[in-house]
Every structure is written in C-alpha cells, then in structure tokens.
Amino acid sequence: VFPKVPFDVPKATVESYTRFIRVLRDELAGGVSPQGIRRLRNPAEIQPSQGFILIQLTGYVGSVTLIMDVRNAYLLGYLSHNVLYHFNDVSASSIASVFPDAQRRQLPFGGGYPSMRNYAPERDQIDHGIVELAYAVDRLYYSQNNNQIALGLVICAGMVAEASRFRYIEGLVRQSIVGPGDYRTFRPDALMYSIVTQWQTLSERIQGSFNGAFQPVQLGYASDPFYWDNVAQAITRLSLMLFVCSQPPRQSDSPLVIRSFVDRNDPVCPSGETTAFIVGRDGRCVDVKVEEFFDGNKVQMWPCKSSQNANQLWTLKRDGTIRCQGKCLTVRSPQLYAMIWDCTTFYAPATKWEVWDNGTIINPASGRVLTAPTGEAGVTLNLQFNEYAASQAWRVTNVTVPTVTTIVGYDDLCLETNGNGVWLANCVKGKAQQRWTLYADGTIRSQSTLSKCLACSGSCVKLAKIVNTDCAGSANSRWYFDNYGGIVNLRTGMVMDVKESNPSLNEIIAHPWHGNSNQQWFL
C-alpha cells in the first residue's frame, strides 16, 4: 500500500544517491510554499493509506526497511527479519497498518538525538559516509544490541531522512563519494547539526516571513553562532519544510522564482512587520542622508553601519509603506530622486511599495522599481524601468555581511576562476579562487577579486558563456539560487550549465532549465 523507495548502499555512486534522495523528496513533498521552498503535505489532507514511506536499504550482508512518517519526514522504526523495531515515543497503534503481520519490538529510546545519547556517541563524533551507511544497515539487520542499533539509526537518519530535508546535507554525502567503491567519511559540522535542530523553527519563520524577511534563527554552535533571517539564505540549503501554514502568493511573485505550483487555500501564516536594513548594490545599505529626517531629504546608498544607526533601519509596513523614523520612502515623480516625507501629507500612491520575493522593490503607481544608478557610496536612489538588473536588487535583512562559500557542481567539482574564465576543478579547501561571495544584489563574486562578477557574456541567452567580468550592476550579472539547485538569471530564466556535462571543456554556459546534474549546484 505504501510507497517504497529502494537504495543499494554498497553500489552507491553520486548519480544513484542523488536519484534516491530526489525520489524520496518527491514522495514527501506536497507542493511549493509562496517563498519558493517545497514543504511536506498538509497533515489534515493525508489519508491513512498515505501516511508512511518505506525505505528499503541494502547493506553488505542484508537489507532492512526504514519506516518514515510523511507528516514530518522522521523515522519511526525499521523492519528486519519480520520484526518491526520502533522508537519508544512511537505508539504501536500509530503504525499498526505498517507490516501488520510482523512482530513488534519497542526500542528503549526515542527518535530524537537527546534520547539516544545513552546508547550512541555524540553526533559530531560519528563518522558518516557510504561505507558507514552500509555498516549501519548491517547493524540493523543482524544486531540485537541497543547501542549498535542506536548507532545505525543515527547514521541512517543523517544520510537518508535529513538529507531529504536539506540539500546541504545531501551535498555533504555527495562530496564523500569519490567514485564507485571509493568513499570518504565526514562528521556533522556546525551547520548540519544546527539546521537539523532548528528545522521546525526555520519552517515556521520562513512560512511566516514578510517580504522575504523573518525573525532571526540562531545557527551554529553557541560558542560561534550565526543567523539566518531571510528566505534567500535558506532556499539553497533547505529542501523541505514542515507544513505550517501559508500566505496566498501575490500577483507580483516572479514566475522565475517558483517552478512548480503554489499551495492555495491553506491556513494563513501570521506575520509581523519587519524592521531591518535594506541591502543592495555592491553590499551597501539604503540610507537617509546625513541622518537628518526632514521632509524631502534624499535616500542614498552608503556602507552598512550598525543597528544603532536609525537612518539605515527601515520598517516594511503591511500598508505597503517603507518607513525610516516614521517617514515614508517616496518619490515626487519617476524621474526624480528617492526621498523621505511625512506619510500623512504626501501623495499616498507614491508612498506604496511591493517587495517581491526575488528582491525587486516596485512602486505600483509608476510601474518602476527602486534603483541604485551607480555603485558609488552616496549615490541617490531613483526609479527606473525594471530590467531585473543587479542595480535593482535588494534584500531585507539584519545580516549585512555577504555569504562566503564554495559552489559545488557537476561531478562534485568546485566552481573556480583565475581571471575572466570560469570552470570546474577539483575542490581544494581554502583555495581563494574557489571561494565565492554572494551579495544581496544577486551578484556572485570571487573572493580573490570582489570587483568582478559572474555574468553572461552579452545577453543571458541560450549557450551564452559565463565569464568573470567587471561588476556593472547589469541584468546579466543578477542571479537567483532556487530550491532545486539551479542558479537562475532573473532576466531571462536561463540557468548556469556545465557545457555538455563535460568539465574538461572548461566552460559554463547559460541554458534553459532541464534539471540534469550539470545544472545542479550546492553551497
């Protein structure tokens, strides 16, 4: 009755593991949220015959079947030798329809990691990898020792259940697969550990986000924390969210942001108004000039300061206004500069804005978008026709420092540059030419040359070559990371593609989306 997803662990390749996780993810997903991230099905709509997924894993000496709850993608137990072993926080009646003829055995621990600590090592002390997963399956197949069972389940949870929920974890596993029969190990790092722990909180806050921003979620270890407070930070690493609620998608949502259908008629998420920085071109912040709040004062781009500087903190109100110290962001006419003014005395339509999920801020009355006409500090903002240019991209956030990361692509090779060219090469930890800085304006810049941006050579049309060139705030250098692993040019919808799936050509091109592995990227 229940869907079955098989995986032969000892024969794993990057392709077979990716296919396995994709099939599992597709079985779990109930649609795409308005934020562009897939989520699990609405529990209220799940029929009894749809409540579980059976994951059939083959190890070196035997096979077991993991039982997954489709409501939360958690493991409930496993079947081995016609005995169904289940966690002690899972009632036998709740899984009565799963293998009804099998014997039942309740394990002495629950499904959460805190409950397993008395039986298995701490997570950051447990090696993960394909060989370790195969041995984990064998432990579940033959062992009656609770410590061995707990260790096996921890590894299965990390490399199967959690990898289905997080592209970041899937990427860690992929990178551990060197080739057929050639596997490395890894241990959970701070990001893996914390996103798993904070998954429910992330799901709630993302689905309750307003204009892409949400209340910050602390990640990392307590001794070295970092924060996510914007959908753009999560969309590349989070594959599935718990179903919490939704808000109806606005007519202004970009079709390039959401590839699949968007759920509708779901409970509406409560979301509050957001006060944060608005970060844009070249990583600078929207700023009321010289911290003076008189009517008509100009709004400019300026290096981001601290949260103590009121002239860079903006409140995005539910009435469509964007306010700094109570004054509204506005323009006298589309041809003139952006400024602040008393919200109650200015022409109301000129004070109304829509903040699109793709980072565009549009004034509906004029049909034009907020633009930083140059990259210089102190440049006054204005309105221009929407070109989906990097000069027209914004992020509402309290994290003003750009993200620095590697970008891993086809064959688990790293994106690299050393001048104007862009290609894939073997990943080398710490290599500056493989470290990329992701700016709020949608540009992708090599850490070794921050004045250059990845861009299409000419327009981003099919087969256009991707090059590393001087940043100009143009549409051909504005990119969007989607939830499926694509790096999308917002203007044309083309994605970065390893030409002919052949890294030896040393060429990345723009191409229509087809979803094959040469268009899949991991951060």
From Swiss-Prot:
Q: Glycosylated where?
A: N358, N398
Q: Which residues form the active site?
A: Y74, Y113, E162, R165
S-S bonds = C245-C269, C285-C304, C328-C343, C414-C427, C453-C471
**Post-translational modifications reported in the UniProt record:** N-glycosylated. Contains mannose and galactose.
Regarding tissue, the record states:
Expressed in roots (at protein level). Expressed in seeds (at protein level).
Task: Spell out the Pfam families in the cross-references.
Answer: Ricin_B_lectin, RIP
UniProt EC number: 3.2.2.22
PROSITE patterns reported in the protein's UniProt record: RICIN_B_LECTIN, SHIGA_RICIN
* SUPFAM superfamilies listed in its UniProt record: Ribosome inactivating proteins (RIP), Ricin B-like lectins
Q: Where does a carbohydrate bind?
A: D287, V288, K289, V290, E291, Q300, K305, N311, N358, N398
**Quaternary structure and partners:** Disulfide-linked dimer of A and B chains.
What is the protein's name according to its record?
Volkensin
Name the gene behind this protein.
volk38
